């Protein structure tokens, strides 16, 4: 990507427009965004076409190789994270988590579009919301067991809803550990599981039913919403 010759390369934070800060914050918060997700944040493909090359040339963002079909991926650099000023350092997901993490962004965007009164906290921000509750338990006396970071938190009407986007089937023991953690963490008022495999839905429902976790925290299991899917790898 190269900036148009009619635009000067940004060399300081003062060169950025307000929408650039929104893009940089979400690049830091989520770790990675696809170009179409960045376009949603600018709200205009022409603005994206003009601003994204400037962020790249200015050292605020770092493009990935073309890994997924039909889109380019970007992450924030350390310089971009400084500009974002959201209290987090720049990071990039592992290749193993990449497709999942891009799908989580699509899910977050879908939920905020359809529930505009809500706020989203990313996996990186979740501990700020639930910090201090790990050693406390609900009335049934569950021990928290292994720690867990949900894929995101939806803050709505004073409630904290943990959100999980699940594509790969885990063992029943692993689901039991995760669901036990949700049930024994007082700051979590509900859990939404979004799954694309009936086997996952059955396993999560069975674990909650057998252990009674759904008596301590509201649990819903839903299919992936429209527009949310794990994007295919780009073929060599």
Could you say what each language-model-derived stretch is?
Residues 1-92:
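Nuclease-adjacent, charged terminal/linker segments that flank catalytic cores
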Residues 2-15, 21-27, 35, 169-236:
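Non-catalytic C-terminal interaction segments of nucleic acid-processing enzymes
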Residues 64, 94-99, 112-161, 167-174:
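Active-site metal-binding core of divalent-cation-utilizing nuclease and nuclease-like domains
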């Amino acid at each position: 990507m190269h900036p148009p010759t009619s635009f000067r390369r940004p060399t300081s934070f003062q060169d950025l427009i307000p929408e650039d800060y929104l893009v940089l914050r979400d690049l830091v918060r989520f770790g990675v965004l696809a170009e179409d997700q960045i376009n949603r944040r600018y709200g205009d493909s022409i603005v994206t076409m003009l601003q994204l090359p400037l962020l790249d040339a200015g050292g605020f963002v770092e493009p990935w190789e073309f890994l997924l079909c039909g889109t380019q991926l970007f992450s924030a650099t350390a310089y971009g994270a400084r500009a974002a000023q959201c209290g987090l350092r720049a990071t990039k997901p592992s290749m193993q988590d990449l497709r999942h993490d891009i799908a989580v962004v699509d899910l977050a965007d879908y939920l905020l579009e359809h529930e505009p009164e809500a706020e989203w906290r990313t996996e990186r921000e979740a501990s700020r919301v639930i910090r201090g509750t790990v050693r406390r338990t609900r009335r049934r006396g569950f021990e928290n067991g292994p720690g867990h970071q949900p894929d995101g938190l939806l803050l709505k009407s004073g409630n904290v809803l943990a959100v999980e986007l699940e594509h790969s089937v885990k063992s029943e023991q692993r689901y039991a550990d995760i669901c036990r953690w949700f049930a024994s963490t007082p700051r979590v008022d509900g859990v939404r599981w979004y799954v694309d495999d009936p086997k996952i839905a059955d396993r999560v429902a069975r674990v909650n039913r057998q252990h009674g976790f759904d008596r301590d925290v509201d649990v819903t299991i839903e299919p992936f919403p429209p527009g949310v899917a794990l994007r295919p790898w780009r073929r060599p």
